[in-house]
């Protein structure tokens, strides 16, 4: 609900979502605006007029046009692990982040969330967990994105709004980082 609220407040011209749950986040956004959904998995034709779907693998560059708003919530940690019909690729999450950043126009926003913990880890047949600061070191993020907001859920399930990455407990095992980036350069 937090990211749906942030998108509503920002009111972008176009919003694309990458692989988030249709029965959760996507439905929340579709209740008040059009949302384009892109996923590697097929989706049955939506009966909701605000949901537009395209099947695509974001580990590969896609010609979706530029957008001023993009979300990828609890999905990037699965890229390249083969769990959702995608090919096995140890670098799948990095390719995915690069391709997400390339879809965003200058001054556009990217909302991305994933599991956070004290170390970068791969959990077999499940997902990755990232140190909260790892994404800041990704070349595409370093080159053209600026973190404008960070929220997180801790191991107890408590939501912490508008915090610093340094506020995450160093012993966190399985929290959720929610990052809002703004694109500063066209790449």
Regions found by a protein language model. Name each.
Residues 49-60:
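Conserved SAM-binding strand-loop segment of SAM-dependent methyltransferases
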Residues 71, 78-186:
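S-adenosyl-L-methionine-dependent methyltransferase catalytic module, highlighting the catalytic core
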Residues 10-21:
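Conserved class I S-adenosyl-L-methionine
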Residues 21-32:
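Conserved SAM-binding loop of SAM-dependent methyltransferases across substrates and taxa
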Residues 1-11:
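A short, well-structured juxtamembrane/interface segment
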Residues 60-71:
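A short acidic, Gly/Pro-enriched loop at the edge of an enzyme's catalytic core
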Residues 34-40:
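Conserved SAM-binding motif I beta-strand of class I
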Residues 12, 32-33, 107-108:
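A short helix->loop->beta-strand "cap" motif at the edges of active sites that frequently abuts
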């Amino acid at each position: 609900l937090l990211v749906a609220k942030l998108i509503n407040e920002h009111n972008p011209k176009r919003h694309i979502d990458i692989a988030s749950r249709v029965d959760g986040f996507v439905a929340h956004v579709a209740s008040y605006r059009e949302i384009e959904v892109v996923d590697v998995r097929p989706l049955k034709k939506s009966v909701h007029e605000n949901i537009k779907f395209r099947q695509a693998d974001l580990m590969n560059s896609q010609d979706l046009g530029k957008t001023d708003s993009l979300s990828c919530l609890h999905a990037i940690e699965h890229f390249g692990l083969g769990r959702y019909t995608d090919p096995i690729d140890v670098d799948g999450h990095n390719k995915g982040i690069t391709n997400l950043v390339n879809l965003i126009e200058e001054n556009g926003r990217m909302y991305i969330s994933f599991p956070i913990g004290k170390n970068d880890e791969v959990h077999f047949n499940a997902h990755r967990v990232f140190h909260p600061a790892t994404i800041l070191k990704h070349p595409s993020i370093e080159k053209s994105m600026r973190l404008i907001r960070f929220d997180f859920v801790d191991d107890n399930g408590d939501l912490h709004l508008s915090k610093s990455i340094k506020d995450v407990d160093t012993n966190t095992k399985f929290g959720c980082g929610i990052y809002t980036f703004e694109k500063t350069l066209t790449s």
